[in-house]
UniProtKB/Swiss-Prot annotation:
The gene is gpkow. Pfam families: G-patch_2, GPKOW_C, KOW. This is G-patch domain and KOW motifs-containing protein. Belongs to the MOS2 family. Signal peptide: none annotated. The keyword Coiled coil applies. CDD domains: KOW_GPKOW_A, KOW_GPKOW_B. One of its GO terms (cellular component) is nucleus. Residues 176-222 form the G-patch domain. Disulfide bonds: none annotated. Residues 1-24, 83-101, 237-247, 310-359, 366-381 have a biased composition (Basic and acidic residues). RNA-binding protein involved in pre-mRNA splicing. Component of the minor spliceosome, which splices U12-type introns.
């Protein structure tokens, strides 16, 4: 309903219009306001899932639950360059109204990219089909995926060839804790399977444990043990009051604690609240009734019996009581030292008695008729020496980091002469001779080429020369054909063969 003021304005407006028309009767003019009520439609109704079956700890409903798939991020062996000209062909007619100079420039750029790709393909085909191709020659992965010239070199970097970045949905699909593991799986890593080319071993990674909240660097980690729940020291005996020894220490509201450090040191209190995010505890002190906030690792959980006995005992805080406690600690240390000294003295007397007894037995044994037979001596059980595998003309790897300050570490050399079963003379690739090289400083090498010769250094066929026919890198084995047994094939471990660079009968 219109207000009286608006009604008066409307009447005055009608009078003015009638006067301007010379007293003529004018058509009535009316004003109105329209208001529409828009009802917001409710969202999509929630779909309900009904329980159908229970198998052990698994619940089955009407909607099938998708099992989580193994997350694997595949390794990119070859870059896929982003071609903008292909996307431009799919654009609508509105985008074709661009300036002619811009369209011409885009066409020139796409043509340049096409020519660069064709030229690189020609070089690659020429290298593959060339007369002198080394099968062991490998191009690094970064060089294979190198960006064509003219795009990301110089002062101005053009990233038009790069693909579009990942979306937020892609990031949400891959959890942070599973990202590194997914990349390793894409590179071929498998759980409980060793990695490497020659000696595969399943090495357990070092998992760093998260430091508890509120415990900064340099803090005493042993304080965490005091917060562990109490465990009965011995089973209860008949007649013991049940529940005294079995009282569990809980870090929660109502728990009894003693402050170990800070302004309220040695005071007792009860926990009123716990802030796990910041690692702090709200404690109400027994003396004074003050509520304070203390770091979690500065308190010690105590039993109800200890709390009732010492919580309001003010004599504990006096200087005389502290001096008495220190004196008790000193007496306990003295008693421990005396016990240790007494044990040492008793041990000395026992050893002297045993020595005299052994001397008497030795004299009696010498005077007896069986003194010619020596008494059975207890030999120290030392580990058996490693089997010798050194042979002349073997190509080996030096693995001793301490020799000559690590100068020859991880370098390859040739065995020139074998002095003893475990020492030899080696020649480096530069021609330098190294004397008195021990076997434990060296490691066998398996040749990469099948055309190279190998020698069996351990086992039944030690000293035989042959060639590798097939390799099993997963099990670190090789199928070998020896020159002496041309019609037979042997399967040998990598540890029993070594690269041989000496002369052969062929």
């Amino acid at each position: 309903m219109a207000s009286p003021e608006r009604y008066q304005e409307r009447e005055s407006l009608k009078k003015d219009i009638s006067q301007d028309d010379g007293g003529k009767k004018a058509a009535p003019i009316s004003f109105g306001f329209s208001k529409t009520l828009i009802k917001v439609k409710s969202g999509k109704a929630e779909e309900r899932d009904y329980l159908v079956e229970v198998e052990g700890k698994e619940l089955k409903g009407t909607k099938p639950v998708e099992k989580p798939k193994e997350l694997i991020i595949p390794l990119i062996h070859k870059n896929r360059w982003y071609r903008q000209d292909a996307e431009r062909a799919d654009k609508t007619s509105e985008e074709k109204t661009e300036e002619p100079s811009q369209v011409k420039q885009d066409t020139v750029e796409s043509q340049a990219v096409k020519e660069l790709i064709e030229e690189s393909q020609k070089y690659q085909d020429r290298w593959k089909n060339g007369p002198q191709s080394d099968p062991n020659f490998a191009i690094p992965l970064l060089m294979q995926n190198q960006v064509p010239d003219g795009f990301e070199d110089g002062d101005k970097v053009n990233v038009d060839l790069r693909p579009e970045s990942s979306t937020e949905a892609d990031y949400e699909r891959v959890p942070v804790e599973a990202y590194g593991l997914a990349m390793l799986k894409g590179m071929g890593w498998k759980q409980e399977e060793g990695i490497g080319r020659t000696f595969k071993q399943d090495v357990k990674p070092i998992e760093h444990q998260l430091r508890p909240k509120g415990l900064g660097l340099g803090a005493d980690r042993s304080a965490i043990k005091d917060l562990e729940p109490g465990v009965p020291k011995r089973p209860p005996k008949p007649g013991d009051e049940k529940g005294k020894e079995e009282e569990a220490l809980v870090l929660g509201p109502g728990g009894c604690v003693q402050v170990l450090a800070g302004a309220h040191k040695d005071l007792y209190g009860k926990i009123e609240g716990v802030d796990p995010d910041n690692g702090r505890v709200v404690v109400k002190l027994a003396i004074g009734g003050k509520t304070v906030t203390i770091i979690q690792h500065s308190i010690k959980l105590v039993t109800r019996k200890e709390y009732d006995k010492y919580s309001k005992d003010l004599s504990r805080l006096s200087k005389a009581h502290k001096d008495k406690e220190r004196e008790k600690e000193r007496e306990q240390k003295r008693e421990q030292e005396q016990r240790l000294n007494g044990k040492d003295e008793r041990g000395k007397t026992d050893r002297s008695r045993e020595k005299d007894r052994d001397q008497k037995k030795r004299k009696h044994r010498e005077s007896s008729t069986d003194r010619e037979k020596p008494p059975p001596a207890k030999e120290s059980r030392s580990s058996p020496p490693a089997p010798s595998w050194l042979q002349r003309d073997l190509r080996v790897r030096f693995i001793d980091k301490a020799f000559k300050g690590g100068k020859y570490y991880n370098s390859k050399m040739r065995v020139e002469d074998v002095l003893t079963p475990h020492t030899c003379v080696c020649r480096t690739e530069e021609g330098r001779m190294l004397d008195d090289i021990r076997q434990k400083m060296l490691e066998t090498i398996v040749p990469k080429n099948d055309s190279d010769y190998i020698m069996v250094v351990l086992g039944e066929h030690r000293g035989q020369v042959g060639r590798i026919l097939k390799r099993d890198r997963e099990k670190c084995r090789a199928m070998v054909q020896l020159d002496r047994y041309e019609e037979r094939v042997f399967t040998l471990d990598y540890d029993t063969i070594c690269h041989y660079v000496g002369g052969t009968d062929h």
